[in-house]
Amino acid sequence: MTRQSFDAIVIGGGLVGAAIAYGLQRQGLATLLLDEGDIAFRASRGNFGLVWVQSKGLGAPHYQRWTRGSAQEWPKLAAELKERTGIGTGLQQPGGVHLCLSEEEFGKRGEYMARLQREAGNFGLEYRMVRGAEARDMLPGLGPQVVGMSWTPYDGHASPLYLLRALHTGFTGAGGTYQPNARVEGSSAAPNDFSVEAAGQRYRAPRVVLAAGLGNADLAPRFGLEAPVRPERGQILVTERTQTVLPMPTTTIRQTEEGSLMLGDSKEDAGFNLGQSPEVMRKIAQRAVLSFPWIANLNLVRAWSALRVMAPDGLPIYDQSERFPGAFTANCHSGVTLAGTHANRLAPMIAAGALEPGMAPFSARRFNVRSAA
Ligand SMILES: Cc1cc2nc3c(=O)[nH]c(=O)nc-3n(C[C@H](O)[C@H](O)[C@H](O)COP(=O)(O)OP(=O)(O)OC[C@H]3O[C@@H](n4cnc5c(N)ncnc54)[C@H](O)[C@@H]3O)c2cc1C
């Protein structure tokens, strides 16, 4: 007989749900992971793969710390997944750069990084603004139009698809139950007692985690939560494999383990339209060629668009229901970067039954000025 009662149900099998489900199952909670399937919007299958720190958390030091914490957790998570599943995530953390193609961009970037460092306070933020010959030593093949770059030691990249596969394999390997093609339709909520209907089955658990990406906007109110997320489109281009080695990723260009270059990615307000546009693709390619002129010799072999999961202020939303204790939600636009904290820090909080007080700034109550006051 199909099991119908669990310690926790996670709705959404993308990077966020899979990392949390993996963390919960590893903590010993019998966990069910429900995923809608290929017809859903799935950011986790179309992203760029950066494990990125240096552009995160301006004006939100709690997010800066959370992101950096995740970059620190990543090597542990990658090693553990490799050991448990045999799947390598391709993690490399050689540091990373943001390239500036004009003096104006360089000046603005310098101010941005200085402010980020001030806001980091005692936590600190190591970075350098690098110019000229030094920049060209660090990244051979830089184009003459590159004026300089910001560098931090924390940045890196990984394969998002291998990560997703490793999390799923690690989850089921630890005894978790994964149910694909199972869109949650009906549900009922009471404190520490939830039931959801998916694929003709009804499941119950004292904990439920909403990690359905853009689907959270509809699901959250049913569990006494808010997840006002909207789509933001990003387009990505991929070149053929090349033997030229890019020693570290930049904000918009990274080399996969297999040798392809990924070029990206745009930030567009296009609703739920998953189309691609030649103008945006041209801009992405032009900037890549100005950054590294040798890229012009490579053929493009693939291109796609995907939808980010964006909160109104661009920061993650982590929340717990006051009305229905035991219900949680997790939403973010950096699910690769944050996989480390989702599996190793957030999942243990959910397993313990409550988010730590330090997570309060991530609550969706920040959008509701009266209740936040
Ligand atoms: C172009 C682009 C580039 C990006 N680059 C990076 C990057 O370099 N680094 C980084 O860290 N992040 C990046 N991201 C962001 C990252 O991809 C997302 O943060 C992450 O994928 C979000 O994961 P998720 O699990 O919340 O959402 P999704 O991947 O969208 O998964 C949600 C899942 O929920 C399921 N679902 C929805 N509704 C229901 C329902 N009712 N019942 C059951 N299941 C449901 C869907 O089937 C889906 O699988 C990028 C995103 C885009 C679009």
What do the predicted segments below correspond to?
Residues 150-206, 215:
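Helical element adjacent to the flavin cofactor pocket in flavoenzyme catalytic cores
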Residues 87-101, 126-174, 266-270, 325-332:
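Helix-loop-beta segment of a Rossmann-like dinucleotide-binding subdomain
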